[in-house]
Curated annotation (Swiss-Prot):
It comes from Macaca mulatta (Rhesus macaque). This is Alpha-tubulin N-acetyltransferase 1. Specifically acetylates 'Lys-40' in alpha-tubulin on the lumenal side of microtubules. Promotes microtubule destabilization and accelerates microtubule dynamics; this activity may be independent of acetylation activity. Acetylates alpha-tubulin with a slow enzymatic rate, due to a catalytic site that is not optimized for acetyl transfer. Enters the microtubule through each end and diffuses quickly throughout the lumen of microtubules. Its EC number is 2.3.1.108. Residues 209-220 have a biased composition (Low complexity). The modification Asymmetric dimethylarginine is found at R305. Residues 196-239, 252-287 are annotated as: Disordered.
């Protein structure tokens, strides 16, 4: 396949490996390209044209390989170029093969389901003008060595009859294990364990950043120590202790006279009324005659003397009767 730009300058090696980023490979020393030329756009054009040619050769309604699909999936494409025939000195593309790891549920010889993640052949195309010249085997063998897998460990997505004959001719893959999906696996597929897919570029980038500039993680939050379980007071005890506290009433009630504090050792309670500790002892009984005698002997008050001096004519008995 020919293109209007220099393919030989874009792909220095005979076989070029591209991932989802579609970055141009390193250029040879001394090779110059104008700055205005977008190399990634040229790569996207090549992949789109190869996908269309492959879909046409397999009688597919739409291409299964395109630059946009490559950028949205973790697939790898191997592109084979022809440097011998240099039409207009720009080189040409012979074909490509696209692979990628996929998680599949496949049946074994006992029809048991197995969850595997093998390397899958997703698209394979060699230009019609250069078929049966060994280019397909060269490209396929290079992919096996680069991915470090054996032919019987592969799973092929909807292979064409040409591809099945190719695998039978060059790798003796003939007996298939029936599946319920569109993938084809061959006898010996379960004999070896499949290599897990490479870590994602994002995870690799994060791990490298952590190695260069490790960020200290926040310390784990410590929980407060659990209190030792002691004797729990009953609710009634708490109430009694609360009532023991003397609460002073607000002003002016707090100025009222308080009751006298009872003696520390009160006298023993007796059935006698005179000995009652609550009412106290009564005064002894005084006869009426003695009370009157004490009043007569008591000197008069100064005020009474003044009244007697103001009324000398009246006798004390008369004054006592008129009052």
């Amino acid at each position: 396949m020919e293109f209007p730009f220099d393919v030989d300058a874009l792909f220095p090696e005979r076989i070029t490996v591209l991932d989802q980023h579609l970055r141009p490979p390193a250029r040879r020393p001394g090779t110059t390209t104008p700055a205005r030329v977008d190399l990634q756009q040229q790569i996207m054009t090549i992949i789109d044209e190869l996908g269309k040619a492959s879909a046409k050769a397999q009688n597919l309604s739409a291409p299964i390989t395109s630059a946009s699909r490559m950028q949205s999936n973790r697939h790898v494409v191997y592109i084979l170029k022809d440097s011998s025939g240099r039409p207009a000195g720009k080189g040409a593309i012979i074909g490509f093969i696209k692979v990628g790891y996929k998680k599949l549920f496949v049946l074994d010889d006992r029809e048991a389901h197995n969850e595997v993640e093998p390397l899958c052949i997703l698209d394979f195309y060699i230009h019609e003008s250069v078929q049966r010249h060994g280019h397909g085997r060269e490209l396929f063998q290079y992919m096996l060595q680069k991915e470090r897998v054996e032919p019987h460990q592969l799973a092929i997505d909807r292979p064409s009859q040409k591809l099945l004959k190719f695998l039978n001719k060059h790798y003796n893959l003939e007996t298939t294990v029936p599946q319920v999906n569109n993938f084809v696996i061959f006898e010996g597929f379960f004999a070896h364990q499949h290599r897990p897919p490479a870590p994602s570029l994002r995870a690799t980038r994060h791990s490298r950043a952590a190695a260069v500039d490790p960020t200290p993680t926040a310390p784990a939050r410590k929980l407060p120590p659990k209190r030792a379980e002691g004797d729990i007071k009953p609710y009634s005890s708490s109430d009694r202790e609360f009532l023991k506290v003397a609460v002073e009433p607000p002003w002016p009630l707090n100025r009222a006279p308080r009751r006298a504090t009872p003696p520390a050792h009160p006298p023993p309670r007796s059935s006698s009324l005179g000995n009652s500790p609550e009412r106290g002892p009564l005064r002894p009984f005084v006869p009426e005659q003695e009370l009157l005698r004490s009043l007569r002997l008591c000197p008069p008050h100064p005020t009474a003397r003044l009244l007697l001096a103001a009324d000398p004519g009246g006798s004390p008995a008369q004054r006592r009767r008129t009052r």
